[in-house]
Amino acid sequence: MAPIIPNPKRIKSFPTEAAFETWLAANHARETELWLKVHKKDSGLRTVTCAQALDVALCWGWIDGIRKTFDARSFLQRYTPRRAKSVWSQINRDHVARLTAAGRMTSHGRRQVDAAKADGRWAAAYAPIRSATEAGIPRDLRAAIGASPRARKTFRGLGRMNLFALAYRTNAMKTAQGRARKIAALVAMLERGETIVPEKRR
């Protein structure tokens, strides 16, 4: 995959959360990308934080993406409109619940939530790595692993990083056919005794 290079014309900085929200309210429907320049804490410069910016993005149907270094005092965080069929995390589901209770979600943000609930992406939201467990593995993947003694043996030795990776890669598939192929590939990988992330020897 080709590296994503920030477009200088799409780099902006905002001193406050309110300033970023004003920009997104005016541009959420016509812009396709924003590289938010966030100043580091020790820079002494006033800046919206990534946590604040994510709240604003979720309210307007956008989502955060990759982060890139910029200079000694700041970094860039990419924000884009949430794409159809994009996966949700449990963390962002929790953020939406908080923002909804606070009355901050706009109709644009709620539309993304409603679409995710309608097609199952909301229920399939992935857990953070720190809470990844065998119970968090999608049922169809678990069933396929359970049907293979060799895959089951490898699966029993997986740590949180690999459990998270299995769940994420399965839930990231956009179609039933793609999901079935991904599950078959993951089971075959486990049958070979391989893992997505190298496991530490115990």
Predicted ranges, named:
Residues 1-202:
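Charge-dense, helix-prone N-terminal extensions
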